[in-house]
Amino acid sequence: MLARRKPVLPALTINPTIAEGPSPTSEGASEAHLVDLQKKLEELDLDEQQRKRLEAFLTQKAKVGELKDDDFERISELGAGNGGVVTKARHRPSGLIMARKLIHLEIKPAVRNQIIRELQVLHECNSPYIVGFYGAFYSDGEISICMEHMDGGSLDQVLKEAKRIPEDILGKVSIAVLRGLAYLREKHQIMHRDVKPSNILVNSRGEIKLCDFGVSGQLIDSMANSFVGTRSYMSPERLQGTHYSVQSDIWSMGLSLVELAIGRYPIPPPDAKELEASFGRPVVDGADGEPHSVSPRPRPPGRPISGHGMDSRPAMAIFELLDYIVNEPPPKLPSGVFSSDFQEFVNKCLIKNPAERADLKLLTNHAFIKRSEGEDVDFAGWLCRTLRLKQPSTPTRTAV
């Protein structure tokens, strides 16, 4: 079902040395390293703040040295999913706080080594819209992927606190996701393969970044049978096992935006009573002002229309859900509560035929994105209020 991806050869090799005191050789290598990285950053369209933050991250990273299990102090668990457990950890030698993802896999040493090799491509992924990567290693049956810690967590966690995420905030999210996907495609010929709210991370500085993208074909194959859940963000063509491309990432982004906007996974679609409970007033659909329609197909047994709030019905069985995605009309935003630009943007993402679905270039130039780029939105302030985080002393409006 998953297409084998051609391995991406890294354009730049990063082998940080352990800082054990001043050494002309190591210092010279480190400086040459940073000069090389700065040249890479100059190729990107960055503002001054983004450039300084990336340079600061890379300077810190150059001092980290080889990552080893014994050097980590576990602080807390950040989340768990199909891929494994993510913990907040302190790297003792450097003092840096990192997010450490532990993936337990029963695999042969040769496969394990290939995964670690393929993950090294992440060293090359330096963008304001991609979560920073410190390194990966294997220890005691687990692969550890060490990343930049994002103190706002993922958007699925933010949604639990916010209940619904406002359109102006989602405008900034859309810009960051599009720029992140474009960076992966243009600079590294990588598809994300797993765009969803839990893989969009945010922080109190107002940054929005993608994580968990598919750089390792071997890791994807090794985890292919580990899916357990009640929802899917995969496009219809991917579920049908046909050829898929970055257009599939566009579908996943559109589905994620609908979920974040209405407050719950949008399949099956919410009925009028659910929407009224969520938005606090009747929600209409269409130009003629009719109440928002329910699913065009009779609901499966045990899933009656319910007026007891969002997501109150039993979840669909996974086979029902996948059948719905492939055979039923795609989700859409209700009218009357979102701008026509936002509705149209999402509709273009959720066209079932990938050949007709909007591509990255079209979406980047869409009226919704152009309007969002021009809006002064205090994303950092909104996030800190929502999650009750302490805002940095030098707050930013948004890092997008």
Curated annotation (Swiss-Prot):
It catalyses: L-seryl-[protein] + ATP = O-phospho-L-seryl-[protein] + ADP + H(+); L-threonyl-[protein] + ATP = O-phospho-L-threonyl-[protein] + ADP + H(+); L-tyrosyl-[protein] + ATP = O-phospho-L-tyrosyl-[protein] + ADP + H(+). GO terms for molecular function: ATP binding; MAP kinase kinase activity; MAP-kinase scaffold activity; metal ion binding; molecular adaptor activity; PDZ domain binding; protein serine kinase activity; protein serine/threonine kinase activator activity. The keyword Ion transport does not apply. Catalyzes the concomitant phosphorylation of a threonine and a tyrosine residue in a Thr-Glu-Tyr sequence located in MAP kinases. Activates the ERK1 and ERK2 MAP kinases. Activates BRAF in a KSR1 or KSR2-dependent manner; by binding to KSR1 or KSR2 releases the inhibitory intramolecular interaction between KSR1 or KSR2 protein kinase and N-terminal domains which promotes KSR1 or KSR2-BRAF dimerization and BRAF activation. Residues 282-310 are annotated as: Disordered. ATP binds at residues 78-86, 101. Its EC number is 2.7.12.2. The active site is at 194 (proton acceptor). It is an enzyme of class 2 (transferase). Belongs to the protein kinase superfamily. STE Ser/Thr protein kinase family. MAP kinase kinase subfamily. MAPKK is itself dependent on Ser/Thr phosphorylation for activity catalyzed by MAP kinase kinase kinases (RAF or MEKK1). Phosphorylated by MAP2K1/MEK1. The gene is Map2k2. Pfam families: Pkinase (PF00069). The modification Phosphoserine is found at residues 23, 222, 226, 293, 295, 306. Its cofactor is Mg(2+). GO terms for cellular component: cell cortex; cell-cell junction; cytoplasm; cytoplasmic side of plasma membrane; cytosol; early endosome; endoplasmic reticulum; focal adhesion. It is found in: Cytoplasm; Membrane. The record marks 10-11 as: Cleavage. SMART domains: S_TKc (SM00220). Residues 72-369 form the Protein kinase domain. The modification N-acetylmethionine is found at residue 1. This is Dual specificity mitogen-activated protein kinase kinase 2. Gene3D superfamilies: Phosphorylase Kinase, domain 1, Transferase(Phosphotransferase) domain 1. One of its GO terms (biological process) is response to ischemia.
